[in-house]
Amino acid sequence: AFTDHYIRLVEGFGKQAVIWGALTHAKGDTPVKSENIIMNAWYNGYADPATMIKDGYQLISIPDAMVYIVPLAGYYQDYLNEVFLYKEWTPAHIGKAVFEEKHPAILGGMFAIWNDHAGNGISVKDIHHRVFPALQTLAVKTWTGKETSLPFEVYNEKRSAISEAPGVNQLGRIGKSPALVYERSTVAPGSTSTYPEIGYNYTVSFDITGAPEKSGTELFRSPNAVFYLADPIRGMMGFARDGYLNTFPYKVNPGEKATIQIEGDHRSTTLRVNGKVVEEMNIQKCYFNAGKDSMSYIRTLVFPLEKAGNFNSRIENLKVHNYRVSK
């Protein structure tokens, strides 16, 4: 009764109803309208696709085990298996049910990202890092099905040269091959940069001569993140983004001279001082409910470069590489 009621309510506003498949699992006694109704076929145990097609529904192929992303959850996928999807999957594959290619009742395919674990440190940038390559691959497969024109390895190489969209660079890519992509001999307080940020993978290094700094003193900021010389709470080196503050067990003392290096990728952020690792902020396992439950916590950073803060320390020899130099 619930599903049929809301289908008709939606249609009453002149809209086409789209529902998530559940009518095998929760069939009920009330007949449910199927004419001109689109159903997301996500789990065959909840909605058997052959039965749903027979009943008159139009399907969108979105099989959970194949195309669901749940970041750092430990179930479903953290990143889609694009090699498998490119080589083996088409919208005609709904879980273990396989239909004829271009079946008239299957409108196409989709993927989904579900952020089930609030508080796990995943940033908007991390979500985009998962979504964009999946979007590219699903676009190929929903347009071409089995008739892909390139081997995956060639496709994977060629797509790296394509921008996300005109004027869009959410991944923070600088340069197309591993290189030193930006440098400055000195960084003056309040100065601006050619680039707003650099995304994974990267290495940012600089020489510092320490001076007294107030808590909250920024080295760089962008619209998406802040890197602190002295964080607002403990005065340590660290960074903030998406409502999370992560700090390293290190601060520059007045008069101290040091070479600082920060490396970042899609799983970690590492601080080195004078060539020695201070901390590699990789994925943590956090426990709660008296230790009965746990959740992964990630501490990634798309490094901000847009504007320097109002610091007192001297910053020299800034170098930005678009790869991790230690790897």
Task: Identify the residue ranges that each predicted region occupies.
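Substrate-binding cleft of secreted/luminal carbohydrate-active enzymes
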Residues: 63-70, 81-159
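Carbohydrate-binding surfaces of carbohydrate-active enzymes
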Residues: 7-16, 22-23, 121, 133-200, ...
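Flexible glycan-contacting loops in extracellular carbohydrate-active proteins
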Residues: 278-316
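Extracellular glycan-recognition modules
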Residues: 179-238, 315, 320-325
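Short tryptophan-centered beta-strand motifs in secreted/extracellular beta-sheet-rich domains
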Residues: 204-206, 256-273
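Active-site neighborhood of glycoside hydrolase catalytic domains
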Residues: 1-38, 42-56
